[in-house]
Amino acid sequence: MSNYDTKPAAAAFKMISADDAYRIVCATCSSIAKSVQGLPLATAHRHVLAEDIHARDPVPAYRASVKDGYAVNSSDGPGKYPIVYECHAGVDVSKLPPLQRNTVAYISTGGPLPEGADAVVQVEDTCMTKDVVDGKRVVEISKHATPSEDVREVGSDMAAGECVMKAGTLIEAAEVAMLATVGVVKVPVYRMPQVAVMSTGDEVEEPMTEVLPLGKVRDANRAMLLAAVSEAGASPIDMGIARDTEEKVEQAIESAISRGADIIISTGGVSMGNRDFIKGILQRIGTVHFGKICMKPGKPCTFATIKREGDRSIVFFGLPGNPVSALTTFHLYVSPSIKILQGLPDSKLRINCYVTTTSNIQMDAARVEYRRVLVEYVSEPGETAHGKIVAHDGMGAQASSRIMNYHGANALLVVPSQADRLGETVIPAGTVLPAIILGGKRILRHTVKYE
């Protein structure tokens, strides 16, 4: 018997819309202060920039050649000229004499233009002769260069003092290159959120269990969500399995807090059974912002915050125990919360698009449904700009316990309820509906349609 009578309070949660739940999650997480740290450039990858970055120096810092060729004075025009020296990338041209009229210097891509040169003629527009003048080989220039031709001017890529990267930018490979270019040694970034994941229930066993006793299931949720946390850009903390007593569940929550979790995710224990303790515990130790969503799957999804010493706030998501419900609510609510605590702007929280359905879809009577679908761009042979994005609802039965229908899916199709569509019961094929593109490697593919 539990020491706490949690059911009456837990039963009192008002059902809210999926859109309202999303707004509450975003507003709550946006109000939580984010900590900033300075990381070496080598470890800043996949973090979010916390401050604007300005170029200390112009890039390039010198007039540089765009191509392999010859530095010339453009007023000399075509003709045969001696090659007086070479300007390779990395050469200090300040130590070379100015280029005199009617002479040229060999220059490589990225090499600095010497004083006296104002253009580059690419190798393809020249021909090496057998002539020698004062011990210098002679090249024939066949093109009349114009001033600054094939020259990168000082600051043409980045001007000194220019803001080259805004706070809120996710640092990926290209951003690492930019930061290295402007000489940033320590990168100011938001600390990556720490996300604790735990499963609850007496029926749950570790995935490596070879022979399951009757009534037991392998814990797919925890492994799934730990992977999803990493995909979303946070650091996962594996909290294991909390058995079905109120004390064990609360101990697991407190342990996650003590280990520095910014977000805690539990699965199971959020419905109305006599061993569903999550909502009651959260009401005692924190603030429950919602405990029931008018959506399918994921109705009992619970969102709360827990205050601790100072101004520390821990975000808590109680996800349903069915694997599909857990992963769907993760994509819809947990993933955006991770991105907010990472420091990403609102525009980066979800990738939304509109798609055309390819089959009839039965609507739920009262709840919006998030169906696992394969979304792709389809065009006719020879078409490049007139195709359309379609959603294939062929992932099998959409039961909340059937994780197999996530395999191969790359989007969640947002299907309105019958109540939303004034009593209609079926969405006909060819209807345009919103969809949410899933993260990770589930990219939108292109298919050319052949009859």
What residues fall within each predicted segment?
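Phosphate-interaction motifs
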Residues: S2-K186, T384, I389, D393
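C-terminal terminal segments
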Residues: K7-P8, A64, D346-E451
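Solvent-exposed alpha-helices and their adjacent loops that cap or buttress functional pockets
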Residues: R63-S65, S74-D76, S94-Q100, L113-E115, ...
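Short beta-strand segments
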Residues: Y106-S108, S142, K166, V197-T200, ...
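Phosphate-binding glycine-rich loops and their immediate beta-loop-alpha structural context
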Residues: D150-S266
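Short glycine/threonine-rich loop/turn motifs
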Residues: D202, K216, R222-N352
